[in-house]
Amino acid sequence: MKMIVGLGNIEKKYEGTRHNVGFMVVERFVEEHGGNFNKEKFDSLISELFINGEKIIVIKPTTYMNESGRAVRPLMDYFNLTTEDIIICHDDMDLEIGHLRLRQKGSAGGHNGIKSIISHVGTEKFKRVRVGIDHPQKMSVVDWVLSRFTKEQEAKLDDGLTRAVAALDDWIENDDFMNTMNRFN
Protein backbone atom coordinates (compact mmCIF):
# COMPACT_ATOMS: atom_id res chain seq x y z
CA MET A 1 0.00 0.00 0.00
CA LYS A 2 1.14 3.52 -0.80
CA MET A 3 -0.16 6.96 0.10
CA ILE A 4 0.04 10.00 -2.18
CA VAL A 5 -0.52 13.38 -0.53
CA GLY A 6 -1.28 16.57 -2.42
CA LEU A 7 -0.74 19.80 -0.52
CA GLY A 8 -2.98 22.83 -0.85
CA ASN A 9 -5.63 24.92 0.85
CA ILE A 10 -9.10 23.41 0.70
CA GLU A 11 -11.29 26.53 0.54
CA LYS A 12 -12.87 27.33 -2.83
CA LYS A 13 -11.15 30.74 -3.00
CA TYR A 14 -7.76 28.97 -3.23
CA GLU A 15 -8.65 26.76 -6.21
CA GLY A 16 -6.27 27.36 -9.09
CA THR A 17 -3.69 29.22 -7.00
CA ARG A 18 0.01 28.43 -7.14
CA HIS A 19 0.03 27.05 -3.59
CA ASN A 20 -2.59 24.46 -4.64
CA VAL A 21 -0.43 22.76 -7.25
CA GLY A 22 -0.16 19.69 -5.01
CA PHE A 23 -3.95 19.37 -5.05
CA MET A 24 -3.90 19.75 -8.84
CA VAL A 25 -1.48 16.84 -9.18
CA VAL A 26 -3.51 14.42 -7.05
CA GLU A 27 -6.82 15.53 -8.57
CA ARG A 28 -5.50 14.75 -12.05
CA PHE A 29 -3.98 11.47 -10.84
CA VAL A 30 -7.27 10.33 -9.29
CA GLU A 31 -9.27 11.44 -12.33
CA GLU A 32 -6.97 9.56 -14.71
CA HIS A 33 -7.44 6.41 -12.63
CA GLY A 34 -11.23 6.75 -12.59
CA GLY A 35 -11.51 7.57 -8.91
CA ASN A 36 -12.88 10.39 -6.80
CA PHE A 37 -12.41 11.89 -3.39
CA ASN A 38 -15.46 10.31 -1.79
CA LYS A 39 -14.31 9.69 1.78
CA GLU A 40 -13.35 11.98 4.62
CA LYS A 41 -11.20 10.96 7.58
CA PHE A 42 -8.57 12.58 9.80
CA ASP A 43 -8.91 16.06 8.30
CA SER A 44 -8.52 14.76 4.74
CA LEU A 45 -10.49 14.05 1.60
CA ILE A 46 -9.56 10.53 0.53
CA SER A 47 -9.61 8.51 -2.67
CA GLU A 48 -8.85 4.79 -2.49
CA LEU A 49 -7.60 3.31 -5.75
CA PHE A 50 -6.33 -0.11 -6.78
CA ILE A 51 -3.55 0.05 -9.35
CA ASN A 52 -1.83 -3.13 -10.52
CA GLY A 53 -3.40 -4.91 -7.55
CA GLU A 54 -1.98 -2.46 -5.01
CA LYS A 55 -4.08 -0.20 -2.81
CA ILE A 56 -3.19 3.46 -3.31
CA ILE A 57 -4.53 6.01 -0.83
CA VAL A 58 -4.64 9.55 -2.24
CA ILE A 59 -5.33 12.42 0.14
CA LYS A 60 -5.99 16.13 0.13
CA PRO A 61 -5.65 17.48 3.68
CA THR A 62 -8.57 19.72 4.67
CA THR A 63 -6.37 21.57 7.13
CA TYR A 64 -4.67 24.73 6.01
CA MET A 65 -1.34 24.17 4.27
CA ASN A 66 0.66 25.03 7.39
CA GLU A 67 -1.07 22.21 9.33
CA SER A 68 -0.74 19.45 6.71
CA GLY A 69 1.18 17.18 9.08
CA ARG A 70 -1.85 17.08 11.36
CA ALA A 71 -3.68 15.19 8.59
CA VAL A 72 -0.79 13.07 7.28
CA ARG A 73 0.41 11.48 10.54
CA PRO A 74 -2.95 10.04 11.69
CA LEU A 75 -3.55 8.55 8.23
CA MET A 76 -0.11 6.95 8.25
CA ASP A 77 -0.96 5.40 11.62
CA TYR A 78 -4.46 4.33 10.54
CA PHE A 79 -3.21 2.59 7.39
CA ASN A 80 -0.04 1.34 9.15
CA LEU A 81 2.29 3.13 6.72
CA THR A 82 5.88 4.30 7.14
CA THR A 83 7.53 7.25 5.43
CA GLU A 84 8.82 4.74 2.85
CA ASP A 85 5.22 4.30 1.70
CA ILE A 86 4.29 7.96 1.20
CA ILE A 87 4.98 10.66 -1.34
CA ILE A 88 4.11 14.35 -1.01
CA CYS A 89 3.21 16.50 -4.04
CA HIS A 90 3.68 20.23 -3.54
CA ASP A 91 4.55 23.58 -5.12
CA ASP A 92 8.12 24.88 -5.28
CA MET A 93 9.10 28.52 -5.88
CA ASP A 94 12.69 27.55 -6.68
CA LEU A 95 11.65 25.79 -9.89
CA GLU A 96 10.34 27.33 -13.10
CA ILE A 97 6.64 26.88 -13.74
CA GLY A 98 5.84 23.27 -14.56
CA HIS A 99 9.34 21.93 -13.94
CA LEU A 100 9.58 18.85 -11.71
CA ARG A 101 12.07 17.82 -9.10
CA LEU A 102 11.68 14.50 -7.34
CA ARG A 103 13.46 13.99 -4.03
CA GLN A 104 13.79 11.14 -1.53
CA LYS A 105 14.31 13.44 1.45
CA GLY A 106 15.34 16.94 2.41
CA SER A 107 14.58 20.01 4.46
CA ALA A 108 11.35 21.98 4.22
CA GLY A 109 13.11 24.61 2.10
CA GLY A 110 10.81 27.31 3.44
CA HIS A 111 7.62 25.37 2.58
CA ASN A 112 5.38 25.44 5.64
CA GLY A 113 3.31 22.43 4.58
CA ILE A 114 6.46 20.31 4.34
CA LYS A 115 7.69 21.79 7.62
CA SER A 116 4.47 20.64 9.30
CA ILE A 117 4.78 17.13 7.89
CA ILE A 118 8.41 16.87 9.02
CA SER A 119 7.33 17.97 12.50
CA HIS A 120 4.48 15.43 12.72
CA VAL A 121 6.21 12.40 11.18
CA GLY A 122 9.54 13.12 12.90
CA THR A 123 11.81 12.91 9.87
CA GLU A 124 12.76 14.61 6.59
CA LYS A 125 13.05 11.20 4.90
CA PHE A 126 9.96 11.02 2.72
CA LYS A 127 9.53 11.22 -1.03
CA ARG A 128 8.42 14.40 -2.77
CA VAL A 129 7.24 15.51 -6.17
CA ARG A 130 8.00 19.21 -6.32
CA VAL A 131 6.25 21.18 -9.07
CA GLY A 132 7.63 24.58 -10.04
CA ILE A 133 5.56 27.73 -9.59
CA ASP A 134 8.47 30.16 -10.18
CA HIS A 135 9.70 32.97 -7.94
CA PRO A 136 7.69 36.13 -7.32
CA GLN A 137 8.97 39.05 -9.34
CA LYS A 138 7.39 42.12 -7.82
CA MET A 139 5.07 40.86 -5.11
CA SER A 140 5.37 39.33 -1.67
CA VAL A 141 5.77 35.57 -1.34
CA VAL A 142 2.32 35.29 0.29
CA ASP A 143 0.63 37.22 -2.53
CA TRP A 144 2.57 35.17 -5.10
CA VAL A 145 1.64 31.70 -3.81
CA LEU A 146 -2.00 32.76 -3.49
CA SER A 147 -2.11 34.23 -7.02
CA ARG A 148 -3.40 32.43 -10.10
CA PHE A 149 -1.49 31.42 -13.21
CA THR A 150 -1.69 33.43 -16.43
CA LYS A 151 -2.97 31.63 -19.56
CA GLU A 152 0.61 31.28 -20.82
CA GLN A 153 1.73 29.85 -17.47
CA GLU A 154 -1.22 27.43 -17.39
CA ALA A 155 0.11 25.68 -20.52
CA LYS A 156 3.51 25.16 -18.87
CA LEU A 157 1.85 24.03 -15.66
CA ASP A 158 -0.32 21.55 -17.56
CA ASP A 159 2.82 19.88 -18.95
CA GLY A 160 4.24 19.71 -15.42
CA LEU A 161 1.06 18.16 -14.03
CA THR A 162 1.08 15.55 -16.80
CA ARG A 163 4.70 14.66 -16.00
CA ALA A 164 3.99 14.59 -12.24
CA VAL A 165 1.17 12.07 -12.76
CA ALA A 166 3.45 10.01 -15.03
CA ALA A 167 6.12 10.03 -12.30
CA LEU A 168 3.60 8.80 -9.71
CA ASP A 169 2.49 6.05 -12.09
CA ASP A 170 6.12 5.07 -12.68
CA TRP A 171 6.82 4.87 -8.93
CA ILE A 172 3.73 2.72 -8.34
CA GLU A 173 4.41 0.43 -11.30
CA ASN A 174 8.12 -0.11 -10.68
CA ASP A 175 8.36 0.44 -6.90
CA ASP A 176 11.80 1.98 -7.41
CA PHE A 177 11.84 5.68 -6.61
CA MET A 178 15.52 6.10 -7.49
CA ASN A 179 14.81 4.99 -11.05
CA THR A 180 11.72 7.21 -11.16
CA MET A 181 13.89 10.14 -10.07
CA ASN A 182 16.42 9.34 -12.79
CA ARG A 183 13.69 9.30 -15.44
CA PHE A 184 11.84 12.46 -14.38
CA ASN A 185 14.45 14.83 -12.90
Curated annotation (Swiss-Prot):
Q: Which reaction does it catalyse?
A: an N-acyl-L-alpha-aminoacyl-tRNA + H2O = an N-acyl-L-amino acid + a tRNA + H(+)
What class does this enzyme belong to in the EC scheme?
Answer: hydrolase
Key words of the record: Cytoplasm, Hydrolase, RNA-binding, tRNA-binding
Q: Where is this site: Discriminates between blocked and unblocked aminoacyl-tRNA?
A: N9
Q: Give me the residues that bind tRNA, please.
A: Y14, Y64, N66, N112
Any GO BP annotation: protein quality control for misfolded or incompletely synthesized proteins
One Pfam family named in its UniProt record? Pept_tRNA_hydro
- Quote the SUPFAM superfamilies the UniProt record gives: Peptidyl-tRNA hydrolase-like
InterPro entries per the UniProt record, alphabetical = Pept_tRNA_hydro, Pept_tRNA_hydro_CS, Pept_tRNA_hydro_sf
Report the CDD domains cross-referenced here.
Answer: PTH (cd00462)
Enzyme Commission code: 3.1.1.29
Q: Where is this site: Stabilizes the basic form of H active site to accept a proton?
A: D91
Query: What is one GO cellular-component annotation here?
Result: cytoplasm
Q: What does this protein do?
A: Hydrolyzes ribosome-free peptidyl-tRNAs (with 1 or more amino acids incorporated), which drop off the ribosome during protein synthesis, or as a result of ribosome stalling. Catalyzes the release of premature peptidyl moieties from peptidyl-tRNA molecules trapped in stalled 50S ribosomal subunits, and thus maintains levels of free tRNAs and 50S ribosomes.
Subunit composition and interactions = Monomer.
Classification via PANTHER family: PEPTIDYL-TRNA HYDROLASE
Family, according to the entry, reads as follows:
Belongs to the PTH family.
Q: What is this protein called?
A: Peptidyl-tRNA hydrolase
Native organism? Ligilactobacillus salivarius (strain UCC118) (Lactobacillus salivarius)
